[in-house]
Amino acid sequence: MSITPQEALQRCIEHRELFHDEMTAMMRLIMSGEMSPELVAGLLIALRTKKETVGEIAAAAQVMREFATSVQVDDRTHLVDVVGTGGDGAHTFNISTAAMFVAAGTGAKIAKHGNRSVSSKSGSADVLEALGVNLALSADQVAKCISTVGTGFMFAPNHHPAMKNVVPIRKQLGVRTIFNILGPLTNPADAKRILMGVFHPDLVGIQARVLQALGMEHALVVYGRGGLDEISLGGPTLVGELKDGVVREYEIHPKDFGLNTAPTNSFKVANAEESKKIVLDVLDGKPGPASDIVCLNAGATLYVAGIAKSIASGIALAKTAITSGAARQKLDTFVVTTQSK
């Protein structure tokens, strides 16, 4: 090994970057349980204090993927993940979860990777479970769902068993670490297209460049101004787009797409059951701000998936998927398929 954990810690304390092979070696020690909890905690805090670089995050993500239980999808046409880092503190209903069924209703193949709530009132796994989805699927069963239904959900604990070495340390620390931003970068189906929400504007450019380093085909990394890890109806959304190997950053606004603005707090929920009700209302065609924000995010998903030529045309397709009943049908078929395993 080119560096010891103690040397890596010292380097971070001095605000010096770890090289790719060094970060790779450190992450392998962490994920395998070979590094002591004290050193893991120290290194995580030192990395956070100096601010993790694009190279360090990319190396860490690659190691997490090495240790993950992968999902083998044969037909990868229009395969896309729609995911958020969480941690935005907005406590909204599960916008991206609703958007996945709308996008699937238009022909996207969704390989969604998510977990239970950490800081929100309802994580993607929580609301899917409330909707009747069986989370305890094997990797092969998830792959079959994606190929037959066009929708698959990879419950993070089922695919990242090595995280058991890190979870107790993260809980004890109680602060954000690099692991808060690694989850969305470690899709077990290796989807090359992604709509990713982040909890801080600084992460938009960083995560877009990490995705670039990881060889993604097309990605939108978004931060809703005012604090939302989705594309917002409350005002501008900062976007980092990776396309054709190039990253560019810009802002979009709901009015760009003919949508009315709505404050983020109008989407707040107290628990997964409340989130479930809004998701079902949207998929059943109830008009209003909740439907608008889902169509906005589904439209962006369809753009990234390569089905729509723009976010605007994606929104139009998303609205049709709802009014035709295709989006609700995707949910119902997905629930039945997961329960029949």
Curated annotation (Swiss-Prot):
SUPFAM superfamilies on file: Nucleoside phosphorylase/phosphoribosyltransferase catalytic domain, Nucleoside phosphorylase/phosphoribosyltransferase N-terminal domain
Residues annotated as binding 5-phospho-alpha-D-ribose 1-diphosphate: 84, 87-88, 92, 94-97, 112-120, 124
Cofactor binding annotation: Binds 2 magnesium ions per monomer.
Annotated pathway: Amino-acid biosynthesis; L-tryptophan biosynthesis; L-tryptophan from chorismate: step 2/5
Catalytic activity: N-(5-phospho-beta-D-ribosyl)anthranilate + diphosphate = 5-phospho-alpha-D-ribose 1-diphosphate + anthranilate
Pfam families named among the record's database cross-references: Glycos_trans_3N, Glycos_transf_3
Alphabetical list of InterPro entries matching this protein: Anthranilate_Pribosyl_Tfrase (IPR005940), Glycosyl_Trfase_fam3 (IPR000312), Glycosyl_Trfase_fam3_N_dom (IPR017459), Glycosyl_Trfase_fam3_N_dom_sf (IPR036320), Nuc_phospho_transferase (IPR035902)
Keywords, comma-separated and alphabetical: Amino-acid biosynthesis, Aromatic amino acid biosynthesis, Glycosyltransferase, Magnesium, Metal-binding, Transferase, Tryptophan biosynthesis
EC number in record: 2.4.2.18
Annotated residues for binding of Mg(2+) 2: 229-230
Origin superkingdom: Bacteria
Binding-site residues for anthranilate 2, renumbered to this chain: 170
Record's subunit section: Homodimer.
Family listed: Belongs to the anthranilate phosphoribosyltransferase family.
Name this protein carries in UniProt: Anthranilate phosphoribosyltransferase
Source organism: Polynucleobacter necessarius subsp. necessarius (strain STIR1)
Lineage of source species: Bacteria, Pseudomonadati, Pseudomonadota, Betaproteobacteria, Burkholderiales
